[in-house]
């Protein structure tokens, strides 16, 4: 007689590894991490989705403040008091809000990007299927620096962000390929005015320019040290077949992925499946007024969240 218990999702651990579960056995030529970046309304989401479909990879849309809501429970989006006390509409309406809203927003988004990147790595190591992501925690800093340049946030926020960024992504492996879509700011503004949400149309052109400068002057040079880089104009990015051809010609002969083996992949998989551990560095104990709340308010919000 066979005993049948309740069905449970088994978590990967050392026993699975001892029994022969190896990441490299599942890998194919497309078992890679690709990221697609660009300014607002640059068409990065469309290109990322097309690449994923063409190469049989998994597409990860850009992580927003509700990323955790969408992947847990029944997918219901919870109020902003459970999501960092922030929202995009308020940011565009008042980017210099004196209560520190702009930094709360970007810090919360960064945490969600870190969580999503961990999910992407876990998917790759578990299934062998490659992933294509719309932005990542590696490029997120261009928004924070643009906010600082525009006077939206205080220097202490910039310093805090740099600290949590360094300690939160150092355990990850960077993307194999970073794709950048270069759309001039005037064209970005035109697209936002034509198809953007009403509050997005208030975005400052100088803020958009700072985002572009951050990508070109800092992100691309830095990521090129460990990852392959492809850059396209908006028109070139429309030709997905040409993009796929360019990807196929890449050698992928640099970066830390080349130094990995089944043992290191085993430890990485253990790390990225522990989502609480992944997010611990994002919540280091520092007194930053913009993102700090009182104990009573914390307790009230916490128990409200538990009751949802």
Where do the protein language model's features map onto the residues?
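N-terminal mitochondrial targeting presequence
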Residues: 1-28, 308
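Hydrophobic anchor at the beta1->P-loop junction of P-loop NTPases
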Residues: 36
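Conserved lysine of the Walker
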Residues: 44
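Hydrophobic positions on the alpha1 helix immediately C-terminal to the Walker A/P-loop
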Residues: 47, 51
């Amino acid at each position: 007689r066979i005993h049948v218990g309740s069905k449970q999702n088994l978590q990967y651990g050392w026993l699975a590894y001892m029994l022969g579960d190896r990441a490299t056995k599942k890998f194919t030529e497309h078992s890679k991490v690709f990221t697609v970046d660009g300014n607002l309304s640059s068409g990065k989401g469309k290109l990322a989705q097309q690449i994923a479909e063409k190469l049989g990879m998994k597409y990860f849309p850009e992580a927003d403040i509700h990323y955790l809501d969408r992947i847990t429970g029944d997918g219901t989006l919870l109020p902003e008091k459970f999501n960092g006390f922030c929202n995009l509409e308020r940011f565009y309406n008042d980017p210099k809000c004196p209560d520190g809203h702009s930094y709360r927003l970007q810090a919360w988004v960064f945490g969600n990007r870190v969580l999503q990147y961990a999910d992407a790595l876990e998917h790759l190591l578990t299934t062998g299927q490659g992933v294509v992501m719309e932005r990542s925690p590696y490029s997120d800093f261009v928004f924070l620096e643009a906010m600082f340049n525009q006077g939206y946030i205080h220097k202490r926020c910039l310093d805090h962000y740099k600290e949590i960024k360094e300690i939160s992504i150092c355990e990850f492996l960077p993307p194999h390929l970073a794709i950048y879509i270069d759309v001039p700011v005037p064209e970005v503004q035109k697209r936002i005015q034509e198809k953007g949400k009403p509050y997005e149309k208030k975005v400052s052109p100088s803020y958009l320019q700072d985002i572009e400068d951050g990508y070109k002057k800092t992100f691309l040079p830095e990521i090129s040290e460990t990852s392959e880089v492809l850059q396209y104009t908006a028109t070139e990015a429309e030709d997905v077949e040409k993009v796929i051809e360019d990807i196929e010609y890449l050698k992928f002969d640099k970066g830390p992925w080349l130094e990995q083996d089944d043992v290191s992949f085993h430890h990485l998989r253990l790390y990225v499946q522990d989502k609480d551990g992944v997010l611990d560095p994002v919540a280091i104990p520092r007194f930053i007024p913009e993102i700090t709340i009182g104990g009573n308010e914390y307790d009230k919000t916490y128990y409200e969240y538990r009751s949802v």
